[in-house]
């Protein structure tokens, strides 16, 4: 029989626990008992495994011992962090009644629910990464997707049209928690993701969603937010907002608006492209040697998060980009002065979210005060910068002199971690608080004087006055001198080496101290809550200030990077094309111990595709990726690593670079490669930048070459995308002769004996050979194997002197022109003697031949 079925047989306290647990059956319940959070029954067993804590038993209830595990309240943040990182959610149940006045168990209630996507506590968050809660909805017309960063109030929705776009969004946003409807059809799209939460269908109803959102924003309709005609996105947003409210158990005043993210506003990159370009995560899953690792020297966590959002959503609006470029140029002479001051601002964005949720701690308010104290100097430094966008940011960041003054008066310089510890509110802020503190301090002084007086009066040098939470104040005398205690000393406690006593005078002062300390602490908590009430009316302006400071941090950082790393300002042109002079790979040039070989690139409507040949390790992939990264950097407004760059409009960036088996989905390397290729051929346009590396290598030579040729033809002739096409199929170097807008380039290498030197420089024309054996030798393949390979190569070349192609009718026939296999029907006819057939046999042969066709 389960605990809940045998409800009446339990003790009153366990009945209270079981009622609360029944409201949160799917998640762990932290049940506050004194100085511990306790977990019982299955929760205790689960927590014991997840947190590696002891599983014990507590007495008995309903005749059965109760499995129990507990954690001390002061260490709860560490344990919550571990659980959240494992995708768990926790309901925090606190004592809200007074034990002194309670009849039966102290009243308790769940005050908040901590989930991976709704955390705002500093200890639980990674400071330089967004932590998103997301919801996904699907109907016959496509998907709806909404994300919320509860630690900043940033609320977004979109309507991905197809599965590929939805997959790219999931990869870009990487939510910590994902809500989905119970009838969600495309489970393979989200399986294996962390923090999956199945929600009932009614939470996704469109009318409920509109009502929820209008109530949150205080509006009559959603037209002003530009989301009125996005029903699928609104369904997801409604569910998400309801979940956030349910878990936080409070209003969410910092969520003030919702924004529609449209495909046409940014350069679209699918999941494979984001992975291959290693924007914020390398192929091994780490953060080293990524584009963000080079570009992100921001000095505030909120600036770092904003830069990563820019990198994952490059904007197509050249007006915004030119404004950013102009700002970066204007700030280059001011970075050394601005960055140290900006560093002091800290993570104002997340502090404001905790303020809105009323969970901000004393040190949060101290940091907010410190941020306000930087504003006058920042504003003074920016005043001399000749740039309209910079001046707009300066105005947006505000001054908040009154709030700064309030916090300077209210909070001590270095407050304790928690307000319940007391000593947070500064002296002089509140007269009544000062009076209670003076009483408590005065009584403490008296007790010190009492100790000196009694020691002198009794002549007992081991006598001292002390305090503990159970017995209150006492006079302690060592066991050796206890027989000399005066007659008016009343024994209170006996210890191994000492006796403790009380006298009426001490008891009187104990009452006074405890009363004054209790009154002071209660008043301090009240004053602290009132500070929230004084700060929250300014929340909108404060959030705008935090946003402006984060943007300033990003732009100052990009200005510093441009100067330090010798980047130049790219020029935007109207027609499709990319012209790069002396381009460099932003990441590779930072990790090389030798100078990076810069290379040019020229793509235009008249030169749409480059067929890139050259040896493995020659630099083909680096050359292709650097082109995409330079384009990406240009479209976040950054300066770029080159001598000169002109870049036209780009709607999408695709990369088909490298592949591995997708064992989880049962897809081979070749299947993964072809799926990514199909996505490109279906979605690329003349404004797309396409990187194709080694198409067709996952299958037989003829099949692979055929596919590579057909893909290149389609991209060059039909789609007309700007394409870099790297290949080892030398037959493809004939494409420029057969099609307009295609050109050959190659990466150079020099071979000397058994060694090879990679020049890493891009030259016009096709490569003369692939240097495969030299690369194999360089990789350490045994010499006898290399020697045998050379023999075999000479044999093959002697059979087909022109290795790649054979001359037929004066034209060059590539491997594509393989003689067609003889039809079985033709073979059968050749072996047939019609003169020897009877009429019946002839009829049978007609049917047989028909079946062979």
Swiss-Prot record:
It comes from the Bacteria. ATP binds at residues 614-621. One of its GO terms (molecular function) is ATP binding. Keywords: ATP-binding, DNA damage, DNA repair, DNA-binding, Nucleotide-binding. Disulfide bonds: none annotated. Gene3D superfamilies: 1.10.1420.10, 6.10.140.430, DNA repair protein MutS, domain I, MutS, connector domain, P-loop containing nucleotide triphosphate hydrolases. One of its GO terms (biological process) is mismatch repair. PROSITE patterns: DNA_MISMATCH_REPAIR_2. InterPro entries: DNA_mismatch_repair_MutS, DNA_mismatch_repair_MutS-lik_N, DNA_mismatch_repair_MutS/MSH, DNA_mismatch_repair_MutS_C, DNA_mismatch_repair_MutS_clamp, DNA_mismatch_repair_MutS_core, DNA_mismatch_repair_MutS_N, DNA_mismatch_repair_MutS_sf. Belongs to the DNA mismatch repair MutS family. This protein is involved in the repair of mismatches in DNA. It is possible that it carries out the mismatch recognition step. This protein has a weak ATPase activity. This is DNA mismatch repair protein MutS. It comes from Escherichia coli (strain SE11). The gene is mutS.
């Amino acid at each position: 029989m389960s605990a809940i079925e045998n409800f009446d047989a339990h003790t009153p306290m366990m009945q209270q626990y079981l009622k609360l647990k029944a409201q949160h059956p799917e998640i762990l319940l932290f049940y506050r008992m004194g100085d511990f959070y306790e977990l019982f029954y299955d929760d205790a067993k689960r927590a014991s495994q997840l947190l590696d804590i002891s599983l014990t038993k507590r007495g008995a209830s309903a005749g059965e011992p109760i499995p129990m595990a507990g954690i001390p309240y002061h260490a709860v943040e560490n344990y919550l962090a571990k659980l959240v990182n494992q995708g768990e959610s926790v309901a925090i149940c606190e004592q809200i009644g007074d034990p002194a006045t309670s009849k039966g168990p102290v009243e308790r209630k769940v005050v908040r629910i901590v989930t991976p996507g709704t955390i705002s506590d500093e200890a639980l968050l990674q400071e330089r990464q967004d932590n998103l809660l997301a919801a996904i909805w699907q109907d016959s017309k496509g998907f709806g997707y909404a994300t919320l960063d509860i630690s900043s109030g940033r609320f977004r929705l979109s309507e991905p049209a197809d599965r590929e776009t939805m997959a790219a969004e999931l990869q870009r946003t990487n939510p910590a928690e994902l809500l989905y409807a119970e009838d969600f059809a495309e489970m393979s799209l989200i399986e294996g993701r962390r923090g999956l939460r199945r929600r009932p269908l009614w939470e996704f109803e469109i009318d409920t969603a509109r009502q929820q959102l209008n109530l949150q924003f205080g509006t009559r309709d959603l037209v002003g937010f530009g989301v009125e005609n996005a029903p699928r996105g609104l369904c997801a947003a409604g569910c998400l907002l309801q979940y956030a409210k349910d878990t936080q158990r409070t209003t969410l005043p910092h969520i003030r608006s919702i924004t529609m993210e449209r495909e046409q506003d940014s350069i679209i990159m699918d999941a494979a492209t984001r992975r291959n370009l290693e924007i914020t995560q390398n192929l091994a899953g780490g953060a080293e040697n990524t584009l963000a690792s080079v570009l992100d020297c921001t000095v505030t966590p909120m600036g770092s998060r904003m830069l990563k959002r820019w990198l994952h959503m490059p904007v197509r609006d050249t007006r915004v980009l030119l404004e950013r470029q102009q700002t970066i140029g204007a700030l280059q002479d001011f970075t050394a002065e601005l960055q140290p001051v900006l560093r002091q601002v800290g993570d104002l964005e997340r502090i404001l979210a905790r303020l809105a949720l009323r969970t901000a701690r004393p040190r949060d308010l101290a940091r907010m005060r410190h941020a306000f104290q930087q504003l006058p100097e920042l504003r003074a430094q920016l005043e001399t910068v000749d740039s309209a966008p910079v001046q707009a940011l300066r105005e947006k960041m505000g001054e908040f002199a009154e709030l700064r003054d309030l916090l300077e008066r209210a909070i001590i310089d270095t407050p304790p971690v928690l307000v319940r510890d007391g000593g947070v509110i500064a002296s002089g802020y509140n007269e009544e608080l000062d009076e209670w503190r003076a009483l408590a301090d005065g009584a403490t002084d008296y007790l010190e004087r009492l100790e000196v007086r009694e020691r002198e009066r009794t002549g007992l040098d081991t006598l001292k006055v002390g305090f503990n939470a159970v017995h209150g104040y006492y006079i302690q005398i060592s066991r050796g001198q206890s027989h000399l205690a005066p007659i008016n000393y009343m024994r209170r406690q006996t210890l191994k080496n000492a006796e403790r006593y009380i006298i009426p005078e001490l008891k009187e002062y104990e009452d006074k101290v405890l009363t004054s300390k209790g009154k002071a602490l209660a008043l301090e908590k009240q004053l602290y809550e009132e500070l929230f009430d004084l700060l929250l009316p300014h929340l909108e302006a404060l959030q705008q200030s935090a946003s402006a400071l984060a943007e300033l941090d990003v732009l100052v950082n990009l200005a510093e990077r441009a100067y330090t790393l010798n980047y130049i300002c790219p020029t935007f042109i109207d027609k499709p094309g990319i012209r790069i002079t002396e381009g460099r790979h932003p990441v590779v040039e930072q990790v090389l111990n030798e100078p990076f070989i810069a290379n040019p690139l020229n793509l235009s409507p008249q030169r749409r595709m480059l067929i890139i040949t050259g040896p493995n390790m020659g630099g083909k992939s680096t050359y292709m990726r650097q082109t995409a990264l330079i384009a990406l950097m240009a479209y976040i407004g950054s300066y770029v690593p080159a001598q000169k760059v002109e870049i036209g409009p780009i709607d999408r960036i695709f990369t088909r670079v490298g592949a591995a088996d997708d064992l989880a989905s049962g897809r081979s390397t070749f299947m993964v490669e072809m799926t990514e290729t199909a996505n490109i051929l279906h979605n690329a346009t003349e404004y797309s930048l396409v990187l194709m590396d080694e198409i067709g290598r996952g299958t037989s030579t003829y099949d692979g070459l055929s596919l590579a040729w057909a893909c290149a033809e389609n991209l060059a002739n039909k789609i007309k995308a700007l394409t870099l096409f790297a290949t080892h199929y030398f037959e493809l170097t004939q494409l420029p002769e057969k099609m307009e807008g295609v050109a050959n380039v190659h990466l150079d290498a020099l071979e000397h004996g058994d060694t090879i030197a990679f020049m890493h420089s891009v030259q016009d024309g096709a490569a003369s050979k692939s240097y495969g054996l030299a690369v194999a030798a360089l990789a350490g393949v045994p010499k006898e194997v290399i020697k045998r390979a050379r023999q075999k190569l000479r044999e093959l070349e002697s059979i087909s002197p022109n290795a790649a192609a054979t001359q037929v009718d004066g034209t060059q026939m590539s491997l594509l022109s393989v003689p067609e296999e003889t039809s079985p029907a033709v073979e059968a006819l050749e072996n047939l003697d019609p003169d020897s057939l009877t009429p019946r046999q002839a009829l049978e042969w007609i049917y047989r031949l028909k079946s062979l066709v």
